[in-house]
Amino acid sequence: MKWTVLLLEYFLVKVLVLLYSADGEAQQLEGFIMLSGSNGSRDEESVSEPPHTEDKCRGYYDVMGQWDPPFVCQTGNYLYCCGTCGFRFCCAYKNSRLDQSTCKNYDTPVWLTGQTPYKKTLDPRHDPTKDKTNLIVYIICGVVAIMALVGIFTKLGLEKAHRPHRESMSRAVASVMQGARQGQHEEAIGMHTQHYDTVQARANNMQAGQINNMMQTHPYPALSQLSHVYEQQQSAKDLNKYASLKAVAAKANGDFLNKQHRHLVELAAKGNLPLHPIRMEHVEPTATYVTEVPCIKQNGQKPKSIKANVSHPAMAYSSNTIANPGMLRSWEAAETAGRRKTYNPRKMCMVEQVNELHTARSHHYLPTQPYFVTNSKAEVTV
């Protein structure tokens, strides 16, 4: 029973509270309507506010202690000062507007005003005029430069001192070698001159014999006279050919000696010539001398040809016909004084016998056509 009474009381209290709250809201609403009805013109004036055109950001000290001057936000839609107290900027949103009255960084910070400028304290014992550190560096560089110059000049002096000795040695060696080459060259020229004199004497003897034979008169031209004329022409050709070959050989020898001389001079100039003497051998080209000489027998047999191979040590010499038997001999080789002169025995026919046979025939028979023997394979009779 007791609990029932308590529940009823609680229920009644709730109902009364609800009623009281409903009456209070009705009274507030009636009072608001009355106020709005009595002050309508003032509310209309407060609603029609002018549009926001600009906002000014005040000057402040940023977090680095630097002063940022004030600026105005009036560009386009960026009409509000936004950001933080240490970093401010213009924006277009009103709800992001910064309340600048709450910031405290409009005055100089305490940590910035408390610093004092650093002053360099000079040591009274230190005298900058007596500081010799730079002087030591200059002294070291100067000593190094002087040592380098001394080394360079010493090297140049040593080279200059040894140069005259080297030049004198090279000149002496070159002169000795040049004298040896000149002696060899003169010896070779003497050999060629001796050969040329021998050939010239033989040619003169041959021409004298031909003139004596031509002085004889015959009723008809003898075969011996025609053969002598042909042989004279051949001997002149042989002499010309020999002279040309001699000139070519002398030129070749001179070029060879000049090349050797130039090479030795270069070696002497370089200073690397050997100290021991060098033996230079003069090698001359060799060639064979081939000819055929007809040999006519008394009994009327066919003539036989004798081939003689003669090696000439100085130059090559060849011809088709020999004028006299003396030219069949080998050229005398006079390279050294101790060499022996060798001759190969050959069977030869005397041209005088041939001339006598042709002279005897010319008195009894009519002159025949001259027949000349050459080395060519196809012999022609004129």
Swiss-Prot record:
Glycans are attached at residue 39. GO terms for cellular component: AMPA glutamate receptor complex; dendritic spine membrane; ionotropic glutamate receptor complex; postsynaptic density; postsynaptic membrane; synapse. GO terms for biological process: regulation of short-term neuronal synaptic plasticity. Residues 1-26 form the signal peptide. It is found in: Cell projection, Dendritic spine membrane; Synapse. InterPro entries: Shisa (IPR026910), Shisa_N (IPR053891). Residues 27-132 are extracellular. Residues 154-382 are cytoplasmic. The chain crosses the membrane at residues 133-153. It is a single-pass type I membrane protein. Keywords: Cell membrane, Cell projection, Glycoprotein, Membrane, Postsynaptic cell membrane, Signal, Synapse, Transmembrane, Transmembrane helix. Component of some AMPA receptors (ionotropic glutamate receptors) complex. Belongs to the shisa family. SHISA9 subfamily. Regulator of short-term neuronal synaptic plasticity in the dentate gyrus. Associates with AMPA receptors (ionotropic glutamate receptors) in synaptic spines and promotes AMPA receptor desensitization at excitatory synapses. This is Protein shisa-9A. The lineage of its organism: Eukaryota, Metazoa, Chordata, Craniata, Vertebrata.
